[in-house]
Regions:
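A conserved active-site cap/scaffold subdomain adjacent to cofactor or substrate pockets
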Residues: 1-17
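A cross-family glycoside hydrolase active-site/sugar-binding cleft signature
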Residues: 12-14, 45-47, 122-124
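Glycine-rich, proline-tolerant flexible connector loops at the mouths of alpha/beta enzymes
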Residues: 15-18, 124-135
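An alpha-helical appendage that flanks or caps ligand/catalytic pockets
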Residues: 19-119, 151-164
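Short glycine/threonine-rich loop-to-helix capping motif typified by GTGT followed
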Residues: 55-58, 131-141
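Short, amphipathic alpha-helical "lid/cap" segments that border enzyme active or binding sites
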Residues: 102, 106, 136-143
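Alpha-helix-loop-beta-strand connector modules within alpha/beta enzyme cores
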Residues: 140-154
Length: 164
């Protein structure tokens, strides 16, 4: 964070597990470093995993087996414990997995944008070997419904001035 601030580099956080709010101290450190090195404020972005479908149930049901398979493979390679459905549900509820209906994903995304003061968000859509047609549906819903709704939510409840 300090080095990025020192050299005036933009920041994008790859948050793939756990609550995004735990990265707030890093964002603040980056902002302080920009200020200390007399750099102009720069955009801050975030990259996380997600899947958007017509309903929460459809999104969860579709994404779960692909997410599980992807994490099982990574777990075998890295010696991690095997993923569970409870872990999947927890990542959706409080973590950095943006899975659900357009409204659910937009609401969670707007909250994350506010907490971290983000100006950009990169959705790594459809974790695992999700079929092409379902990936295209996620892309369409994200662009047509999620993003406009996020903009509405942000406009309705502006942040506290910390956005980069």
């Amino acid at each position: 964070m300090i080095r990025a601030g020192r050299y005036g580099l933009p920041l994008i956080l790859a948050i793939i597990s756990g609550p995004p709010s735990r990265f707030a101290p890093y964002v603040e450190l980056y902002r302080r470093a920009l200020e200390q090195y007399r750099r102009a404020p720069l955009p801050i972005g975030m990259h996380s995993l997600g899947y958007v479908a017509g309903t929460d149930e459809e999104a969860i049901e579709t994404q779960w087996p692909y997410w599980r398979d992807q994490l099982e493979a990574a777990s075998r390679e890295r010696g991690w414990r095997q993923p569970t459905y409870e872990q999947f549900q927890s990542e959706i509820a409080e973590g950095s997995l943006y899975v659900g209906s357009p409204e659910t994903v937009a609401t969670k995304l707007a909250a994350t944008i506010r907490v971290l003061g983000l100006s950009r968000f990169d959705l790594a859509y459809a974790v695992g070997q999700v079929p092409h047609e379902q990936r295209m549906t996620t892309i369409a819903l994200y662009g047509r419904e999620v993003i406009p709704r996020v903009r509405e939510l942000i406009a309705a409840a502006p942040d506290d001035g910390n956005a980069g």
